[in-house]
Amino acid sequence: MEEKGKKLGLWNIIGLGLGGAIGTGIFVLLGYGIAYTGRSISLVVAVGCFFMLLAYWYNLAMPSLFVMKGGDYSMKTMLFNPFMSGVSAWMTLVSGLAMSSYAVALAQYLAIAVPSLQNYQTVVAFVAMTLFFLSTIKGSRFLTILENIVTLVLVAALALFVAFGIGKVDFASTFSSADGGFFHGGFTGFVSALAVMGWACQGTTMAPISMAAVTKNPKRTIPLGIIVITCLLAVVYGAMGIVAGGVLPYAETAGQNISVTAQAIFPNALYIFFVVGGGIGAIASSLLGALGMMRYPLLQVANDGWLPSVFKKTDKNGYPYAIYLLFYVISIYPIVTGRSLDAIVSQVMIPTMLINIYMNLACLTLPKKYPEQWAQRSIKMPLWFYNICCVLGAFCAGVVAYNLFKDLTFNDAVFAVAIVVVLCVLSILRLKQGAVKAEDLASKKEEIVRQAIADTAADETEAA
């Protein structure tokens, strides 16, 4: 049911989107990026915001043509064939692997706050993941309030990090490569850092596209909001990168989370605030939010037939315990097997980027298929430029996938390939079994296209 009341304007979308984009990734991955590129990490994260915007080009292109009230689900349904629908559905489950990265990062920060936990990080991560999954049983209202509070604390922590750290950076040498600290790994290292930091820089489109149903003039507001969010995030992350890479020597920050730099720049009280309120709070909030947001996509996967019918089961309150239990098992697998945080991120990002390649290239067909909507697009650009952006978007997604893959260990690379193969095999298998019927998917696609066209026409009439 569509929400009633005052609709969101541009600044509402910017606020929501920026809050959603600034998340856990920058806390836990900045040190891995520094390991590849040294002090040029500031350029990596600033450029990375625009690079990842291109990698998610379809999230900017499609909302400029249509009012997509179903967000990401509607966009993918509109462009996917039956096989890719299955791959995307199974990918929803595989994304559970990424949930473990939050728990691993949380354990790292807890070990900083409570040093006696240093040798028990795997146990802490396992217990944390279990408790967070149990918390989903009680619903999301309290968690949503908590997330809003923690977001304010997070923004305050990052602002303090930049404010206290920027004065301790030696700008005379920060952007110099004389000591090998700037562009530490050369161009290859820069691109590898760009790929690793993609996880932290990819969130600029997620929140805005999910809000189309409650946004005023969404065809204009959402694309414009995404562009502004990306610019602001590039400035914030760039400033953080200057501090994280420029205060301490490379050897002390490479591969470490930013609490190492925070300890060097903050008084003890503010350092504790940064670790607990910023690090632990942000990670916990992100994990709770991610688990809550997965409820309906997971149910959709089960209800569409991609999973056996047992996974449709819910308790008397509607809690989908069967599918959440499966998701939990997937989420704790990297923890109990001891996979590294950067490997976990890579193994989820690689198939995600492969799906993005498909989506970005599929956008090439939209102007011809929907000439009326193309003529009324909110981002006025010539067709040749739009086509270049589609191809560039696929290229950027491919660059991220390739660079993440090449930097994996042999065992992690095999696991990443296995994930992609299993996604494809399960999609084909369920279609051949008739558990999911291609004609049903086609009907759903037609309905979503009709609804998108109708909503777009209604929005244009209202705006006129």
Feature names for model-found ranges:
Residues 71-81, 112-114, 225-288, 307-344, ...:
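TM-loop-TM module centered on a large, flexible mid-protein loop between adjacent transmembrane helices
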Residues 32-35, 44, 54-129, 133-137, ...:
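Hydrophobic transmembrane alpha-helices that form the core helical bundles
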Residues 3, 42, 116-120, 148-272:
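Helix-loop-helix junctions that connect adjacent transmembrane segments
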Residues 2-4, 37-42, 59-84, 106, ...:
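Flexible loop linkers connecting adjacent transmembrane helices
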Residues 157-161, 348-375, 394-399, 418-440:
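Hydrophobic alpha-helical segments of multi-pass membrane transport proteins
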